[in-house]
């Protein structure tokens, strides 16, 4: 059974649920289903551990972070296998990208925590102001199911490195690697209570956690509706909300079309299309639209859909039957709205092995001649479905890109540097990638605008949620003080 990790030990619950392999439909095992009682224990443990952990020298915290990163690196094959088993993500992506990146998160933030440098502001020879970065306290880290381990470590590493303690709540759909994170943290020597892992449903464990009065900050990755609800009900806390996306890809006639094609395919179909930064709306200038669309559809048809455990697989299975139904429901909507289906669709991929007969597989699906007002272009699908939309000129491209409730990532393809800068300035998104797919640098701020969330994480931007800034004002002893009542 997969249990909770509370105060440095495994803890059971009276309630359990069954975890399933989405590629086969087979049960993996039982998972402890936490609620208010387990959350109370975890928050209490984190609160008790906080003063000592916050007072631990940064160099010692950094040493423990690096040790945890080393243990993750040593366990990459095992962790990748669990992640693929749990989520349906292709093994070549979990093993070669996601789990190694999780290890790097701890290495990177181990360095960041030793550089919590404030600023000083002298006022002539009268006063000196300086700032301190100090830990917040108990933080709730709520991680999604699509890339669970990488996202969990992306939150845990800066949180702990900066002197906070944490309660990590994983999605009930992807509990396996979170359990391993709890185990490896103990093995690394992280003091008990500093990192606690709660399993369970969002409506019970998650709700109890974000509402808890002793939780001082919330870092959440998930759907926009859930993020809004948390901010409406959890009270006065620090928030980092990385929510949904409908990211535009703008491809101009002067772009390197071959590289743009490679990047556009990768950006939508990697991670099974279940990624917040997916380039799900691809806008192509009219003069190159027919050529690009034909080549894109042909390439999409050649992608390998199949067993996530097969290193050759490029697109695995959807996470659950419910999510499969949601994605295929949008494919039906696209057909009803009059978009042109060029690849994929509702038919199951051909030549799936017998043991995958109950898996939730969807072919990479390409819709052309889409109007940006269609539901498939406006609503987050979170699967391997893409909209190809023509545009006339730069002004229309910008208008279409911004015509959405979301604003997470955006991608611009052009050789005109002036055009690239104008669009980067005008586009309503937290991140802009020019002539590139989503290439992450841990120093960069990650986050969105509008319906894609609030706050930023990454490098020193993680201080926004995981640190409090305190100002200290010192008089040199000679500044004027009004004398009242003399």
Residue ranges of model-derived segments:
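Hydrophobic face of amphipathic alpha-helices that form TPR/SEL1-like repeat modules
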Residues: 1-24
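N-terminal alpha-helical segment of soluble enzymes
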Residues: 22-87, 287
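Conserved C-terminal structural/oligomerization subdomain of aldehyde/semialdehyde dehydrogenase
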Residues: 24-30, 215, 250, 304, ...
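Short, well-ordered beta-strand elements within core beta-sheets of diverse protein domains
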Residues: 27-34, 49-55, 141, 249-252, ...
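Rossmann-like NAD(P) dinucleotide-binding subdomain of oxidoreductase/dehydrogenase enzymes
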Residues: 118-259, 391
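A short hydrophobic/small-residue beta-strand
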Residues: 165-167, 341, 431
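ALDH superfamily catalytic-core signature
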Residues: 225-371, 434, 481-482
């Amino acid at each position: 059974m997969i249990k909770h990790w509370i105060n440095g030990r495994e803890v059971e619950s009276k309630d359990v649920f069954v975890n399933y392999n989405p590629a086969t439909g087979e049960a993996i095992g039982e998972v402890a289903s936490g609620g208010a009682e387990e959350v109370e224990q975890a928050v209490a443990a984190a609160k008790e551990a906080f003063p000592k952990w916050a007072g631990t020298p940064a160099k010692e915290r950094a040493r423990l972070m690096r040790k945890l990163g080393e243990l993750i690196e040593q366990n990459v094959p095992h962790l990748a296998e669990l992640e693929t088993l749990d989520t349906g993500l292709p093994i070549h992506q979990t093993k070669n990208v996601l789990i190694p990146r999780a290890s790097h998160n701890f290495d990177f933030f181990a360095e960041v925590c030793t550089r919590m440098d404030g600023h000083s502001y002298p006022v002539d020879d009268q006063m000196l102001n300086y700032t301190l970065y100090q830990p917040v306290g108990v933080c709730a880290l709520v991680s999604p199911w699509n890339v669970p381990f990488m996202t969990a470590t992306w939150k845990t590493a800066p949180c702990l490195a900066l002197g906070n303690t944490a309660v990590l709540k994983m999605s009930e759909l992807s509990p396996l690697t979170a359990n391993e994170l709890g185990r490896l943290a103990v093995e690394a020597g992280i003091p008990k209570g500093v990192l606690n892992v709660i399993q369970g449903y969002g409506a019970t464990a998650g709700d109890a956690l974000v509402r808890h009065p002793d939780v001082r900050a919330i870092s959440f990755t998930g759907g926009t509706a859930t993020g809004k609800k948390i901010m409406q009900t959890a009270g006065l806390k620090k928030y980092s909300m990385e929510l949904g996306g409908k990211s535009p890809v703008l491809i101009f006639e002067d772009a390197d079309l071959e590289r743009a094609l490679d990047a556009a395919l990768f950006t939508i179909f990697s991670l099974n299309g279940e990624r917040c930064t997916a380039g799900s709306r691809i806008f192509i200038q009219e003069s190159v639209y027919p050529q690009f669309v034909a080549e894109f559809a042909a390439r999409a048809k050649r992608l390998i859909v199949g067993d996530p455990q097969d290193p050759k697989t490029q697109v695995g299975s959807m996470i659950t039957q419910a999510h499969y139904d949601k994605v295929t429901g949008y494919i039906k909507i696209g057909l009803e709205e009059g978009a042109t289906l060029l690849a994929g669709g509702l038919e199951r991929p051909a030549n799936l092995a017998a043991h995958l007969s109950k898996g939730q597989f969807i072919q990479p699906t390409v819709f052309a001649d889409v109007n940006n007002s269609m539901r498939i272009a406006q609503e987050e699908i979170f699967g391997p479905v893409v909209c190809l939309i023509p545009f006339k000129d730069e002004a229309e491209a910008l208008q279409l890109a911004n015509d959405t409730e979301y604003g997470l990532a955006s991608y611009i393809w052009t050789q005109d540097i002036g055009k690239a800068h104008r669009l980067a300035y005008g586009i309503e998104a937290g991140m802009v990638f020019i002539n590139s797919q989503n290439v992450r640098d841990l120093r960069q701020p990650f986050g969105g605008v509008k319906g894609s969330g609030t706050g930023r994480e990454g490098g020193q931007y993680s201080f926004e949620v995981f640190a409090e800034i305190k100002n200290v004002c010192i008089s040199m002893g000679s500044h004027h003080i009004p004398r009242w009542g003399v």
